[in-house]
């Protein structure tokens, strides 16, 4: 059994789509990043790579590589799944938290879960996604960015 922990954060900016868990969420700002800046999927990828001792997403998908410009993070997640499977690991479960003051994530979590489970070929009960605010505190509370944490168990 191997445990991995992932964390990601991106700044909210104008003129970018807000994509979290592969879901485009209506909002006046989106997340800035080289790829689609999907903080949830990035945190999950780092957790999976960490548990398998395979480094992090920056090692495998550097922001200096034009091939990853605006790429869907779900495509990268599929590649991470292949990497960990190649090493002989299988996902037991993943638990995640999205930290955002706005917009409310509650209405989008089911679609996020569906996207990620499909990508990783997981049963619905193997992935949990939660969302919280920081009650107006810090950069997420001031709506300057969104962050996500993920923890996974591999066998």
Curated annotation (Swiss-Prot):
The protein's required cofactors = a divalent metal cation
Q: Does the keyword Coiled coil apply?
A: no
Query: Where, by residue number, does 4-CDP-2-C-methyl-D-erythritol 2-phosphate bind?
Result: 8-10, 34-35, 56-58, 61-65, 100-106, 132-135, 139, 142
The main enzyme category here is lyase
**Stored Gene3D superfamilies:** 2-C-methyl-D-erythritol 2,4-cyclodiphosphate synthase
UniProt-listed CDD domains: MECDP_synthase (cd00554)
Record text on cofactor binding: Binds 1 divalent metal cation per subunit.
- List the InterPro entries: MECDP_synthase, MECDP_synthase_CS, MECDP_synthase_sf
Name the cystine pairs: none
So what EC number does this one have?
4.6.1.12
Q: Where is this site: Transition state stabilizer?
A: 34, 133
Q: Name one GO biological process term.
A: terpenoid biosynthetic process
The record's section on Pfam families has: YgbB
Can you tell me which residues bind a divalent metal cation? 8, 10, 42
| Keyword match Metal-binding | yes
Record-linked HAMAP family: IspF
Instruction: Name the PANTHER family on file.
Output: 2-C-METHYL-D-ERYTHRITOL 2,4-CYCLODIPHOSPHATE SYNTHASE, CHLOROPLASTIC
- What's the stated role of this polypeptide? Involved in the biosynthesis of isopentenyl diphosphate (IPP) and dimethylallyl diphosphate (DMAPP), two major building blocks of isoprenoid compounds. Catalyzes the conversion of 4-diphosphocytidyl-2-C-methyl-D-erythritol 2-phosphate (CDP-ME2P) to 2-C-methyl-D-erythritol 2,4-cyclodiphosphate (ME-CPP) with a corresponding release of cytidine 5-monophosphate (CMP).
Q: How does it assemble?
A: Homotrimer.
Protein name per the record = 2-C-methyl-D-erythritol 2,4-cyclodiphosphate synthase
Lineage at the top is: Bacteria, Bacillati, Bacillota, Clostridia, Eubacteriales
């Amino acid at each position: 059994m191997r445990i991995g922990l992932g964390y990601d954060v991106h700044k909210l900016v104008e003129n970018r789509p807000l994509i979290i868990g592969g879901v485009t969420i209506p909002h006046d700002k989106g997340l800035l990043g080289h790829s689609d800046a999907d903080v949830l999927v990035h945190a999950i990828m780092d957790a999976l790579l960490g548990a398998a001792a395979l480094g992090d997403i920056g090692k495998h998908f550097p922001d200096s590589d034009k091939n990853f410009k605006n790429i869907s993070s779900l495509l990268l997640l599929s590649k991470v799944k292949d990497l960990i499977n190649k090493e002989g690991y299988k996902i037991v479960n993943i638990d995640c938290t999205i930290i955002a003051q706005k917009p409310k994530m509650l209405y989008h979590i089911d679609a996020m879960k569906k996207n990620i489970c499909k990508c990783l070929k997981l049963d619905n009960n193997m992935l949990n996604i939660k969302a919280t605010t920081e009650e107006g505190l810090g950069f997420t509370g001031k709506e300057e960015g969104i962050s996500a944490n993920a923890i996974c168990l591999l066998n």
